[in-house]
Amino acid sequence: LDMDLLTQKRTFEQTKKLVERTQICSVPGLTFQAQLSDRAGNVLRITPGQGHTYLERPGYAVMTNFSPYKGDREKHPWMGLDRYQAARELLEAAHETFDVGDCFAVLKASSQTVCPTVVSMVYDAQQNKVFWCENREWQNIGCRQLENDESRQGAGLQLS
């Protein structure tokens, strides 16, 4: 689903319609959970075999290492319920001028050490930029400007 978005074979809206009419299941030996967002700030959360949730322009959306449909009923060492709760508390207390730096502060405060966080990403919709850091190297933030390309089908975005 998200690969089709990245390769511009499907738009966010097309993905949303697909999830609404088709039960999404993991393939044998592979499991995934997706949280997709469009430039307008809408969020589509997909947990194969369990369901999906569409959030229209939420103030924030936190992705988890556990099923949002099971919550704390299922325990495993990497689930990170404490990190999820810390991130939610920081985001609940966020101020109006919350920016990319503040986002990385939340990601840093909730990064995982048991199974170390490999990539942390922030998308700034106003600047149309993606920021990321790898391996919790918070001092090395990468940045990529996205450009609109209306001549291409799909999401209409490409890396420059």
Name what the model sees in each region.
Residues 1-24:
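Compact, glycine/acidic-enriched structural inserts
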Residues 1-7, 29-32, 37-160:
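C-terminal, well-structured catalytic/ligand-binding subdomain of enzymes
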